[in-house]
Design a protein with these regions (language model features):
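Gly/Ala-rich beta-loop-alpha elbow adjacent to hydrolase catalytic centers
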Residues: 275-276, 280, 284
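Flexible, membrane-associating and regulatory peripheral segments of lipid-active enzymes
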Residues: 23-25, 43, 47-49, 57-61, ...
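Active-site catalytic motif of lipid deacylating hydrolases and related acyltransferases
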Residues: 203-271
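Helical cap/lid subdomain of alpha/beta-hydrolase-fold lipid enzymes
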Residues: 288-424
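The conserved beta1-alpha1 loop
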Residues: 212-216, 277-278, 307
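Bacterial Sec signal peptide processing site at the extreme N-terminus
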Residues: 22-37
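Structural motif
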Residues: 35-54, 295
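Bacterial N-terminal signal peptides
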Residues: 10-20
Length: 424
């Protein structure tokens, strides 16, 4: 699932000369574009027909007038939009697509941000411009400078970069290893095609406990298949966080927290279990802290980390120093990085039960101390993580096989199924 052994190979042999230069060239170009990109966020309010699709239209001011940049079909389970834009001047328009034709005929409920107001994005703008709410009106005429009708071709229809509640099968092609690699080496392309997504395997059932699975570097939700197949389908409903693992880990955690908070507001679930593998454990812990201390929610009741590098990976320091272009998440994975220190600056909330699973079968001793083939055991068993763990379980598996090993899966299922307060 995680393929972190590829990362290890990249960070070895004379300062990352294993990789082809084109990979770093692509990464460098994406990092340059990301540096100048900003995110617009807001909510579409006062929907007349809640079951109808809502289309967000992004206009950009040009010398020739207003031009449609793209359209975004909003996720009805969340009701908010998060769109990425370059430097420029933009206007936001939304409408209810009552007849599902990707067109506004002038009669469907619609609205603009402001009167409308321009959203000016410059190099000095913050990374996120929030609060750009749009209120729909059943009879509002368009301002004179805007067209009286709007028609979007399918190819112009983008999507919100943060999406929650979509139903997907784990065998869906978007969960292939190619997409996992894209999320690591070409995170901006991944955001355009997939976004930050929280997938369901089935429609939400208030009678079942959601179990949120968080993959690691280069991973996809498909890697959880063997574990999910062992869960009690009458008691649990699996959710899967799918994110660009090359981005800074705090951004991935923030996007996850935003989605969980919105889904909690919409669906009202009372409990959430979190299971994370490898680097995903760091993302998950940061999410849990944000969810409890910033969003003030107490829904996360159980957290299980699997083979997580709690003190990072020391070879990433070599990558940060020597690579022609640095994967942003490498900075966070440097041992004792500011991000890692922030993870343990606050304790997990008292209402969260934490169990630590680690793997110890590996033979990468020329470059690493005792390891599971990818991550050093000393990082998996960092004392800061051990101190907060209720129980610690070790398995004779390597970094990837722990997700398919029978004993590890059986123990994980027991932990998830045990009554509250149980020693297991």
């Amino acid at each position: 699932m995680v393929r972190m052994n590829r990362i290890v190979q990249v960070l070895l042999l004379g300062g990352l000369v294993v990789l082809q230069g084109c990979m770093f060239t692509t990464l460098r170009n994406e990092l340059r574009e990301m540096k100048h990109a900003r995110v617009l966020t807001g909510r579409v309010l006062d929907q007349v027909r809640p079951e109808a699709n809502v289309v967000l239209v992004l206009y950009r001011q040009s010398p020739d007038g207003l031009k449609i940049v793209n359209g975004t079909l909003l996720d009805s389970a969340v009701g908010k939009f998060v769109v990425k834009v370059p430097i420029g001047t933009f206007y936001l328009f939304a409408f209810e697509d009552l007849d599902n034709d990707l067109a506004w005929d002038g009669t469907e409920p619609n609205g603009y941000y402001g009167m409308p107001d321009a959203v000016v994005v410059t190099d000095s703008s913050p990374a996120t411009l929030s609060g750009l709410d749009i209120r729909l009106n059943a009879s509002a005429p368009p301002p004179g400078v805007f067209p009286e009708t709007v028609s979007l071709p399918v190819e112009a229809l983008g999507s919100s970069i943060v999406r929650a509640g979509q139903i997907a099968d784990l065998d869906d092609p978007i969960f292939s290893l190619d997409y996992g690699n894209m999320g690591y080496w070409r995170p901006l392309t991944f955001i355009r095609e997939i976004g930050f997504s929280l997938f369901f395997r089935e429609p939400f059932d208030p009678g079942k406990i959601p179990v949120l699975f968080v993959h690691g570097a280069l991973g996809t939700p498909h890697g959880w298949k063997d574990i999910v197949d062992r869960l009690d389908p009458d008691r649990f409903q699996p959710w899967f966080y799918y994110y660009p693992s090359g981005l800074p880990l705090d951004k991935n955690a923030a996007a996850l927290n935003w989605m969980v908070a919105e889904l909690h507001r919409e669906l009202g679930f009372r409990k959430l279990h979190v299971v994370a593998h490898s680097m995903g454990g760091l993302v998950a812990r940061d999410f849990i802290l944000k969810n409890a201390y910033e969003s003030r929610l107490d829904v996360v009741r159980q957290f299980v980390s699997i083979s997580s590098p709690w003190n990072g990976h020391r070879l990433t320091a070599k990558g940060v120093r020597r690579a022609p272009a640095v994967v942003p998440s490498w900075h966070d994975m440097v041992p004792d990085s500011p991000f890692i220190r922030s993870l343990f600056a606050r304790h997990l909330p008292e209402f969260v039960t934490y169990d630590l699973l680690f793997s110890y079968r590996g033979d990468c001793r020329f470059f690493l101390e005792n390891n599971d083939g990818t991550v050093e055991i000393s990082s998996q068993l960092d004392m800061r993580a051990q101190r907060e763990a209720r129980r610690i379980y070790g398995f004779d598996e390597d970094h990837g096989s722990i997700l398919t090993g029978a004993e590890a899966i059986a123990q994980l299922v027991r932990l998830l199924s045990a009554p509250a307060g149980s020693p297991y």
